[in-house]
Amino acid sequence: MSNPRLRVFAGPNGSGKSTLFDAFSKKYNTGIFLNADLIENELRINGFIDLSEFGLNLKQSDFDEFITTERAESLINKAVDENHKINISLKENILVDEGIGTHSYEGALISLFLRHHLQEKNIDFCFETVMSHPSKIDEIKEAKLKGYKTYLYFICTDDPEVNISRVENRVEKGGHNVAQDKISTRYYNTLKNLFNMVEVVDKCYFFDNSGEEIKLIAKLSENKLSLEVEPSELPNWFVENVLKYYI
């Protein structure tokens, strides 16, 4: 029996993670896909999330146990610090938002809950993350201990101002907003975490989206880095946060 697969589509806000995933999913079987923003949007529109859509069958006790975990408590505390309440219940395998008004922390918490239980059942899945917090690295380490083959698809631009502009364009088209200061702060935090994540996963694919189109610039497998473009074409973010460790 082959190992379950976990694919992580990571990069700063506005880098093009969703666009990259959409292109990838047209060519490959990605398993179950988790995107906290899409979960938040579905919760806002419908008021609930049907867990059967993710191949899960869970009870309220499963959710109660989950929210006592360190990562869940940390997320809930962040929500409280920003004056957001999380009031979610699990009834007949459906997560119901019992609160007034949906916010991003609910989408993030539910995504974390789903990842937790998909791992427990060794189900193939992939998820999007900004990867601005080192907890994501620990999460991948745990998946590997459970036998998962892990893949990182990392996409970035060479300037957070590009990301800010693209998020603004996304909002104009009806997409979700992220505060400019958060985009900038997360951009640098994400890059700080990049090499630590690279050391954990089995394979990495690096994409640059600084220009008009997404470009695959490098691959990493078995600690061997192979460039897909000329060295002179490599963006600064890759040179400073990945390449320098392999030359």
What are the functions of these language-model segments?
Residues 196-247:
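NTP-dependent small-molecule kinase module
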Residues 16:
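Conserved glycine(s) of the Walker
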Residues 25-120:
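Conserved substrate/cofactor phosphate-moiety recognition/catalytic segment
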Residues 1-4, 117-119:
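Phosphate-binding P-loop
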Residues 12-13:
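The conserved Walker
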Residues 20-21:
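Post-Walker A alpha-helix
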Residues 6-8:
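Short hydrophobic/aromatic beta-strand immediately N-terminal to the Walker A/P-loop
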Residues 145-193:
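A glycine- and Lys/Arg-enriched "phosphate-lid" helix/loop adjacent to the NTP-binding pocket
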